[in-house]
């Protein structure tokens, strides 16, 4: 199976990178062909162009390569911190440019004037792993956990990926070595579950 792992964090020594590496290694050991993308290290440009916003194909070679991988993968994982209830800018720009109309989704009548979207992605399972410094109960009670809704309903299911697993790890700032080891173990467990879901779909 083809897998795609995308990490959106500016610091290469971040805990997010440790999580992404745990997922990558788990899928490799499970026999997956894994494409790994550190958006910052690759110099991914998050700025959506005017032509792309109109639904025209991107002229950026890296964007086109990411789109091709997104279209061909059987399962995927995205890892990033919670920044004001949203992904960091580089990850949001990756979504804007790579989950492109005609590549990730379309509409029955060929327009976006309220029609129900048709997901085009081949992947049927995805893993979303976020980190934060807000306790999970407060994140849900006060903020409604916007990242869960965004990824699960607003992006992945919108584009045809119906099996979504997500975890929020925190509070990272006050975490212990044991806390982080537990989160990494959880990430590996979830990665295997998502691989199994993709295999069964």
Regions found by a protein language model. Name each.
Residues 2-32, 37:
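N-terminal beta1-alpha1 ligand-phosphate binding loop
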Residues 32-43, 167-170:
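A short beta-strand-loop structural module common to alpha/beta enzyme folds
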Residues 53-72, 183-194:
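Glycine-rich, highly charged phosphate/nucleotide-binding loops
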């Amino acid at each position: 199976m083809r897998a795609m792992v995308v990490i959106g964090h500016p610091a290469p020594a971040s805990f997010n990178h440790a999580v992404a590496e745990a997922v990558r290694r788990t899928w490799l050991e499970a026999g997956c062909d894994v494409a790994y993308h550190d958006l910052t290290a690759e110099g991914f440009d998050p700025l959506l162009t005017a032509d792309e916003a109109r639904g025209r194909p991107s002229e950026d070679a890296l964007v086109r390569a990411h789109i091709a991988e997104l279209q061909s993968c059987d399962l995927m994982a995205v890892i990033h911190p919670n920044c004001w209830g949203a992904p960091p800018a580089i990850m949001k720009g990756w979504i804007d440019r790579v989950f492109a109309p005609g590549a990730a989704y379309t509409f029955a009548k060929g327009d976006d004037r309220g029609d129900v979207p048709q997901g085009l992605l081949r992947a049927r399972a995805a893993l979303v792993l976020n980190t934060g410094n807000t306790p999970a109960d407060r994140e849900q009670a006060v903020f409604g956990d916007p990242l869960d809704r965004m990824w699960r309903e607003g992006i992945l299911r919108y584009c045809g990926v119906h099996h979504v697993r997500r975890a929020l790890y925190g509070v990272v700032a006050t975490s212990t070595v044991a806390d982080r080891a537990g989160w990494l173990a959880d990430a590996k467990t979830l990665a295997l579950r998502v691989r199994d879901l993709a295999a069964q779909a």
